[in-house]
């Protein structure tokens, strides 16, 4: 697992959840 992908998932994951659940 690439560190770059890990960092991307860590930064984009919460944002995607925020947009999907509309709980920002």
Swiss-Prot record:
A GO BP entry: killing of cells of another organism
Gene Ontology cellular component list: extracellular region
Highest taxon of source: Eukaryota
Keyword Transferase: no
Key words, A-Z: Amphibian defense peptide, Antibiotic, Antimicrobial, Cytolysis, Disulfide bond, Fungicide, Hemolysis, Secreted
Intrachain S-S bonds: 18-24
Localization per record: Secreted
Tissues expressing this chain: Expressed by the skin glands.
Biological role: Antibacterial activity against Gram-positive bacterium S.aureus. Weak antifungal activity against C.albicans.
Sequence similarity: Belongs to the frog skin active peptide (FSAP) family. Brevinin subfamily.
Name recorded for this polypeptide: Brevinin-1BYc
Originating organism: Rana boylii
């Amino acid at each position: 697992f690439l560190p770059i992908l890990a960092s991307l998932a860590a930064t984009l994951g919460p944002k995607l959840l925020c947009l999907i659940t509309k709980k920002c």
